[in-house]
Curated annotation (Swiss-Prot):
NCBIfam families: PRK05309.1 (NF003698), uS11_bact (TIGR03632). PROSITE patterns: RIBOSOMAL_S11 (PS00054). GO terms for biological process: translation. Coiled coil: none annotated. The keyword Transmembrane does not apply. This is Small ribosomal subunit protein uS11. Belongs to the universal ribosomal protein uS11 family. It comes from the Bacteria. Residues 12-27 have a biased composition (Basic residues). It comes from Kineococcus radiotolerans (strain ATCC BAA-149 / DSM 14245 / SRS30216).
Length: 135
């Protein structure tokens, strides 16, 4: 059996992702008690840019602050503007402290915010919640 030739795989260059030019999209802000994640997508739901408080450089309990959410939203908005994003509809999920701050910083970076919608899932008495924390 002849050895496999490696020339086919070695000559392959990694492809650069082409920039999508999307003028209108959705900003999904997931704000938990521990972190805030901002994903900016096109109208079909394909992610164009994202950032989280941990990715921006915050660690531990500082990730859950409103300032960390602000920095994450600014970073995601800047990346989305590189792809030509100008207008977003905002979908907010979760009970965290960075909800309003993230929306305000999206507006401050130059993105025009259209509709703001709260999509926090609430159970109709589904799963049993975790036990109370005793400190």
């Amino acid at each position: 059996m002849p050895p496999k030739s490696r020339t086919a795989t070695a000559s392959r260059k990694p492809r650069r992702k082409e920039k999508k030019n999307v003028a209108h999209g959705h900003a999904h802000i997931k704000s938990t008690f521990n972190n805030t994640i901002v994903s900016i997508t096109d109208p079909t739901g394909a992610v164009i840019a994202w950032a989280s408080a941990g990715q921006v450089g915050f660690k531990g309990s500082r990730k859950s602050t409103p300032f960390a959410a602000q920095m994450a939203a600014e970073a995601a908005a800047r990346r989305a503007q590189e792809h030509g994003m100008r207008k977003v509809d905002v979908f907010v999920k979760g009970p965290g402290s960075g909800r309003e701050t993230a929306i305000r910083s999206l507006q401050a970076t130059g993105l025009e915010v259209g509709a703001i919608q709260d999509v926090t899932p609430s159970p109709h008495n589904g799963c049993r919640p975790p036990k109370r924390r005793r400190v």
